[in-house]
Amino acid sequence: MSVRLVLAKGREKSLLRRHPWVFSGAVARMEGKAAPGETIDIVDHQGKWLARAALSPASQIRARVWTFDPNETIDIAFFTRRLQQAQQWRDWLAKKDGLDSYRLIAGESDGLPGVTIDRFGNFLVLQLLSAGAEYQRPALVSALQALYPECAIYDRSDVAVRKKEGMELAQGPVSGELPPDLLAIEEHGMKLLVDIKGGHKTGYYLDQRDSRFATRRYVEDKRVLNCFSYTGGFAVSALMGGCRQVISVDTSQDALDVAKQNVELNKLDLSKAEFVRDDVFKLLRKYRDQGETFDVIVMDPPKFVENKSQLQGACRGYKDINMLAIQLLNPGGILLTFSCSGLMTTDLFQKIVADAATDAGRDVQFIEQFRQAADHPVIASYPEGLYLKGFACHVM
């Protein structure tokens, strides 16, 4: 008989809506013992079967649902089906947009909670972020090796969230050859260098692909400031869009060095590109005091908020940085501003930008809205999957 997690009375509603999480406060009791990550059955207070899930005893999210089908077993065949289903959508996207790199598995939205897999050419980069994902590592890797014999697999499970699940960080080769120090990928006509072994996340921010492409329509003959530039994807796109100048700002010299290489790799005019190692908040104030102005500013900061207790402080940070950017824009300028904080709703982010405009003494028109690229889907039952949001703002 399988181990069962029994829900408290009335706490089954989210599962009936097919939301994939069970929080610790919804649990009445456990029937039987299971190891961290082991598969358990979830039942309501009357014993009615609801879902099959992975147990996370160290986490506030006590269980993550693998399936709502009572006849489905969690094994290699299960992971193979999920991977094949996800691949169908990515095949269409890759062909339509000419991509050789994309997010193959986007966690809960692809029916594999705690699992992130990015494909860069013939390298699969794996992040296992939950106890269940880690427990099922052998089955998942076996399914990947069978479906993608041409691909090497590299683990980037060096993410702090694993500690909340009671797990150590993990990084290194899983199978096949080691990735090169920098791997060139293609995106909307750009070649971009990716550091799989040491870069942010899995090596690159694939989720901003569509936003980078959209930048081109705003930048012709414009002076562009690219804040939190990382390896310069927005800068390369701006140069391909015909900008007059683009200044990329980041605190990491290594990232800026790769950004410069990306400009050179695409045979673009390096004299139009400047790379500044500095703190964005400090530099924006310095530019303001010096009377510098720009026609387009890209504001793509890291996540400011990890939990609800940090939300208020994050709102202040987002407002401050957007106010400074708006102050630096010429009349008729464009602000492309983003938040990758999942706890920051689109409506709240829009209000923050509006408040920033008020504080800057400028009128702003919202002219375009952005979200994560289509290989980062959001399943209807899990709206938390929409974490990246952004706006193009016309500053008057």
From Swiss-Prot:
SMART domains xrefs: PUA
Subcellular location: Cytoplasm
Single GO molecular function: RNA binding
Main location: cytoplasm
Domain PUA: 2-81
EC number(s) stated in the UniProt entry for this protein: 2.1.1.191
Catalyzed chemical reaction(s): cytidine(1962) in 23S rRNA + S-adenosyl-L-methionine = 5-methylcytidine(1962) in 23S rRNA + S-adenosyl-L-homocysteine + H(+)
Function noted in UniProt: Specifically methylates the cytosine at position 1962 (m5C1962) of 23S rRNA.
PANTHER family listed in its UniProt record: RIBOSOMAL RNA LARGE SUBUNIT METHYLTRANSFERASE, S-ADENOSYLMETHIONINE-DEPENDENT METHYLTRANSFERASE DOMAIN-CONTAINING PROTEIN
Name of the protein described by the UniProt record: Ribosomal RNA large subunit methyltransferase I
Species whose genome carries this gene: Cronobacter sakazakii (strain ATCC BAA-894) (Enterobacter sakazakii)
